[in-house]
Amino acid sequence: MTPQIQEKLDEIEKINLENKYLPKDREWITSGPFQIDRSEYVLGEKIFLRIGGLGFDEIGQVAFLRPLNSTHYEIYLTIPFDGSNKSAFNYYLQPQLSKIRGFCSVEDFVGDWRVVFRGTDYPNLEFKITEDILPGDENNYQPVC
């Protein structure tokens, strides 16, 4: 191994030790047939939505709402569901900066999010995105606007 390679490996090891990132355990927060895997995420982590056991007559949308401030939310993404078509499926979501969509900096994602199940009476789910960034994803969260 050349000294340059060893130096690079030592640098990577140092960065890993400084970050001390460990993903939180999955909690599977549930509302009816809908589940998300955690109550808290860092930027860069994927949010895992699991839907299982939809009734044949259950039709609607899962709406992910991002915080605008302490009292107002805005739709980030909607995912349609139709139990007569498919009673179970999974979906991964990873909030990403986008100049086109107006998501310019990490401040657009940090805070308490809600998941609303339109067309049903199931209670909302809530989760938090912190200002921490998944190690290695820092460049993906530099301001774009």
Where are these regions (language model features)?
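Extracytoplasmic/secretory-pathway segments with low complexity and glycosylation-like composition
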Residues: 1-145
